[in-house]
Amino acid sequence: DRIEASVWAFGRGKESWLVEHRVLMGDTARDAVWKSLAEMLAETWTHASGAAMPLARFALDTGFATQEAYAFVRACRDSRVMAVKGVPRGAALIGTPTAIDVSQGGKKLRRGIKVYTVAVSIAKLEFYNNLRKSADVGEDGLTTVFPAGFVHLPKIDAEFIQQLCAEQLITRRDRNGFPVREWQKMRERNEALDCYVYARAAASAAGLDRFEERHWRELERQLGLAGPPALETPTESINEATQRGGLAVSGNRNTGRRVIKSRWLS
């Protein structure tokens, strides 16, 4: 009866900020709620500097309302939109994409939609480890210093926090007596956690795990921020997905139901 979407921002050292969480009410078998979701692709969010930032990537979970989700991805025709499906285990956060669309002859279409598997255990373990981190005070006694991976959360209600922390990693024995680690739900509702997992996968697809200092400097340049002195090594152009995460001209913003808005946005 709804679609839930979280907007997360990521920075140096994989520091993260929950920007916004929306609950779009509506029957997923009907078009209205999907149209509301599509409107987010045209929106921008205001950086603290005043620059407008669009979504760099948009990951859509296809595990529920699968055919409707596929239809949404096809209709968007937007390279930022990626269909994803969570799997318990994997060697990498994002797996090799699988082609879904086929021709009448049964051959997979090269230009059809592809579904990326997401090893949810990797993202959840990283997230829960980062939630344990705390900020420190700089040497001047005034500046707040955040460690790599620190998770910034705005004012959120207890229900949202419980959803973020809805699972725990346990060890059980399989039928052969070998130990197996798996995630176990402690409560039924875990949409907030799922939204983070797929946002983290989207950030990885946009290049987060491969970013070097030069990439962050280029993003800062696009935002009009005065960064540290330039490196001696030349800055190379970054890929299209990263550029979409930089400064863009904003159109009229389509507003939706707001549940959370970060204090880091103006």
Task: Kindly give the residue locations of the regions a language model identified.
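Nucleic-acid-processing active sites and adjacent nucleic-acid-binding tracks
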Residues: 2-58, 262-266
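Short loop/turn segments at strand-loop or loop-helix junctions that form parts
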Residues: 1, 8-11, 62-63, 84-87
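C-terminal nuclease/phosphodiesterase catalytic domains that cleave nucleic-acid phosphodiester bonds
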Residues: 63-235, 239-240
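Extended acidic low-complexity intrinsically disordered regions
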Residues: 220-224, 232, 236-266
